[in-house]
Amino acid sequence: GDVANGGDYSLIERFADLDRQIWDAKGLDRMYGRQIDLITDPRWGRNVTTFTEDPAVMANITTALIKGYQGGTDGLQPNGVGLIVKHFPGDSASYNGFKSHYKTGQWRMYRTENAMEKYFLPGFQAAVDCKTAGIMSCYSRPMPINANQTYRGVDINSDSVATSYNATLLQTLLRDTMGFEGFVNTDSNILFDIPWGVEELTPLERIALMYNAGSDIIGDWWGQPIDYSLALEAYSKGMIQEEALTRATTKNVVSLLESDRFENPYKDLQTSLAAEAAYAPKVETLALEMSTKSLVLLKNHNNVLPLKETGKKVFVASFTRNGEDDNKLANWNRTLTEAGYVIVEKAGEADIVLLDVKPDFPANNGCMNTLDLVEDLEVAEYDTNTGMKTGGMTDLTTLMDVKKIKKYAKAVHANGGVVICSLTLSAPWILTKLEPYCDAILVNFASVTELAGLSELVTITDLQLQVLSGAIMPTGKLPVTLPSCTAVLEVTDTEIDAVRLSQRRARL
């Protein structure tokens, strides 16, 4: 909203700088982030932890983040936190929105020529230009049938292997063409469990290929200590090139030296705890500002907002993927009661029906995500180990009891009342089963307490009621387009079969 209203990205830089100070007080000097994948397929499960669908906006956000965390745009400064931005070269171009942690999501799709240069790489180029400490490579691999890709005139079409094993992407593109000088950190467990495109290689061959391709630091084993004996064995057998090992070791050690890891690796515990306590009020203030500016008024039919009178009767209903959220119901009931509204038990008794709606995807990739608000929708089942359809069906729910929305709306509208929706947007949902029944929709992205990590702050319900009552004007803008239907997003089985055919031909 700041930028759309003539402002800049300073709020993001202030957030990053405050977070940097807290990390520094705790003795933390490297972050496994931040995530700067561009939102392209709205079904992708990691969209909720990135920022935007606009490449230019992503580049500006990335610049602000690096300024705040690293202390500027000329490398890591004293007391800075080195960012390892991810997931290069953009993991969001995924087949049907599947996560690349699973074999169903191993493919990156580029349907148009130079899509990487136009859409996915501007954020990473901004990170390189600001001298980010590190870049994390993604799990997924490019499809053999992708459209032609170049960057600044350089051919970057590559083998169909994951980025950590891909010399074209790490050397030709990232270092030689984009100018990256930091270290490449692979994602976690890339060696054993998620080696897309190199499954036929042994772990010894894989680790040698990673170093030779341009990886410098091998990601952890899901939180377990990293065992580098394989790297030593591969080097002793001549499988890792001398120049590759020298590059990887040098870049890692230089980064540690820049962060004073050797000279001053520890913080005094009491000093650190005192600093954390001192930062709490600053966190509260900034979290409140960010939450306020993020609220988006998506619909206001017949100007039902702002609410002009307190004392009206309100029926509150909560919807999530797993049923009612008791905490949200309690917060809304408290907030409304304190403001003078009367809580009633039936929609037909109310002047206002307030819907608190928070859809979500299932946790695994056993089926294709849908952006529709559905309960127990039968969809094709996928085997996450093979990446193939099983031939069976499974139930998918994104919003339990979704049919009650129409019922509640009909009841309150029959009495001349209105429906107001508080929508927590974790994905670009298709709202055809919600929007027609609502007179007003206010979008939020996270609660104030979730942003701050504290429990005694103003809640998101308090903040939203201030907007609904007109005390605060909503200025936020959606970071992503809400699609009207799923048909334009789906990838056909024929396209995936073409990939398999291409692979079979390559093996032959």
Model-based region annotation:
Residues 1-508:
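Glycoside hydrolase catalytic-domain context in secreted enzymes
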